[in-house]
């Protein structure tokens, strides 16, 4: 029969092992659910993954929005004023989606060079843009530094 001290040590070691296993599972789940953000310039420079999900952010180019006859399928272009990424999306758009306004689309790049969006996020205020999109546009020289408000990171 194990001594009291031996049982306690075994119990503590088992608890630490279970805690380490739980932490490893949580970290693995978080890593597999990460969706990275890229500007259109970075997408064209092949910095974005060729397979897997990522986000593209910028402005919806004026005059680029085309709706299909079904009313749900949409094609438009996201630009950082330097480069452009064509986007195809099927679904309901946010009410604030507009040409010339900020947008972040999540999805993956098709073999034909068209980004297949599974989610479209539009800005929610006339002075707001997601921080990553604002930074990408500033780097491209499309936005003055004080034009937009962004969330605290």
UniProtKB/Swiss-Prot annotation:
Heme binds at residues 124, 128. Keywords: Cell inner membrane, Cell membrane, Cytochrome c-type biogenesis, Heme, Iron, Membrane, Metal-binding, Signal-anchor, Transmembrane, Transmembrane helix. InterPro entries: CcmE (IPR004329), CcmE-like_sf (IPR036127), NA-bd_OB-fold (IPR012340). The keyword Secreted does not apply. The keyword Hydrolase does not apply. The chain crosses the membrane at residues 9-29. GO terms for biological process: cytochrome complex assembly. Residues 1-8 are cytoplasmic. One of its GO terms (cellular component) is plasma membrane. Residues 30-153 are periplasmic. One of its GO terms (molecular function) is heme binding. It is found in: Cell inner membrane. Its main location: membrane. It is a single-pass type II membrane protein. Heme chaperone required for the biogenesis of c-type cytochromes. Transiently binds heme delivered by CcmC and transfers the heme to apo-cytochromes in a process facilitated by CcmF and CcmH. Belongs to the CcmE/CycJ family. This is Cytochrome c-type biogenesis protein CcmE. It comes from Bordetella bronchiseptica (strain ATCC BAA-588 / NCTC 13252 / RB50).
